[in-house]
Regions:
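Alpha-helical multi-pass membrane segments and their bilayer interfacial helix-loop junctions
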Residues: 42-45, 70
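Conserved nucleotide-cofactor-binding alpha/beta core module
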Residues: 127-128
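Surface-exposed amphipathic alpha-helical tracts and adjacent flexible/coil segments at the periphery
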Residues: 1-25, 30-40, 55, 61-68, ...
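Conserved phosphotransfer cores of two-component systems
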Residues: 111
């Protein structure tokens, strides 16, 4: 494993101003955010009029500004796409994150000074995929969230292109941005940030014509949330250039807490200090937002682990197991969880 010459960049999400400011204050090296169009998060983002101020606010604090353009673009939209890209360039953004290789080529044509990053929506899972993105102008590639540490190590050994990986946040049951269930069932395009999240619904299971009793495990397609704090030293040592936190729909508290957690972990790993994770921090991360945190795909693909089936949304912090209910007093007796739970 070979470290890079400088510490990896920490990139935090921003849905709008409160999250952007929280990311800056918590120590992000870069913040990524979208506009109101051509973004995989349709309900949040900045207007074209707000864009210059957002970029300037970040640059005033020596924080990079990355703008997402991470959807596919149709021919009928190319004029609007050109206007948006020109505005991103004029605002002084440090990079634009793209999915569509046609858009990547368009950036090189109309804004050659604007850096292009290949989005995780490209589903790049090999060094050959990295080379393809680089051939279309990508200086950095955000690898698929479905890769293991071993996969990342092999890709890193085969390319010098900057590599970025997600270290925290929601996972897609499909390859990111490739799921068609939302469009097919509800007419809402997941690629355009309108995902209806069919993966978060409760399902019945029929096996050979017979109903299977699922009890409380009916969320058969709902993955847990990624948390790679324990994997930060490995990711630093194998030479990943940027660590990304998912969550443009999350609030400022989430952005502040996750950014602080990974800022501390990256700094400790780079200095080769003890990277023991504070149990109190883990409890805070569970409490701010969690569908069940773990390394999941980074530890290898096992859907029996990634998908627990019990919770489609935020679970909160586990306090223990109910052992007795005192109806007369309106009280519940709870046994705390064991240390290894």
């Amino acid at each position: 494993m070979t470290r890079r010459a400088r510490p990896p960049e920490l990139m935090s999400p921003a849905g709008h101003w409160p999250q952007l400011r929280a990311a800056i204050e918590a120590g992000a090296d870069a913040v990524y955010f979208g506009l109101r169009h051509f973004s995989a998060r349709a309900k949040v983002g900045f207007t074209l009029e707000e864009l210059p101020e957002a970029v300037a606010t970040l640059h005033e604090r020596a924080t990079k500004a990355f703008v997402t353009f991470n959807t596919l673009a149709f021919e009928r939209e190319m004029a609007a796409a050109e206007r948006a890209l020109a505005a991103i360039d004029a605002a002084g953004a440090d990079a634009v994150i793209v999915q569509d290789v046609g858009i990547a080529d368009l950036v090189r044509e109309i804004a050659p000074g604007l850096a292009v990053h290949g989005s995780t929506q490209m589903s790049v899972t090999s060094a050959q995929g990295v080379a393809f993105a680089a051939a279309h102008g990508a200086r950095r590639v955000v690898l698929g969230r479905e890769l293991s540490l071993a996969d990342l190590r092999r890709i890193r050994a085969a390319t010098d292109v900057e590599l970025e990986v997600f270290v925290h946040g929601a996972l897609c049951v499909s390859y990111s941005g490739q799921c068609f269930s939302s469009e097919a069932w509800g007419g809402r395009s997941a690629n355009r940030g309108q995902c209806a999240q069919a993966c978060r619904l409760a399902y019945d299971l029929v096996v050979d014509g017979a109903d299977r009793a699922l009890l409380d495990e009916r969320y058969l397609l709902s993955p847990g949330d990624l948390m790679a704090l324990a994997q930060v030293p490995d990711l630093v040592d194998l030479g990943i250039d940027a660590f990304k936190i998912e969550g443009r729909y999350k609030d400022a508290d989430y952005v502040a807490l996750t950014t602080h957690a990974y800022r501390s972990a990256i700094d400790a790993a780079w200095a080769r200090r003890d990277a023991a994770i504070d149990p109190a921090l883990l409890r805070d991360l569970e409490q701010v937002y969690s569908r069940g945190l773990g390394p999941w795909f980074l530890a290898g693909t096992d859907h029996r682990v990634v998908v627990r089936g019990r919770a489609p949304g935020h679970r909160g912090l586990r306090l223990g197991t109910v052992v007795r209910v005192d109806a007369a007093r309106g009280a519940v007796v709870v046994a705390p969880p064991a240390a290894d739970e």
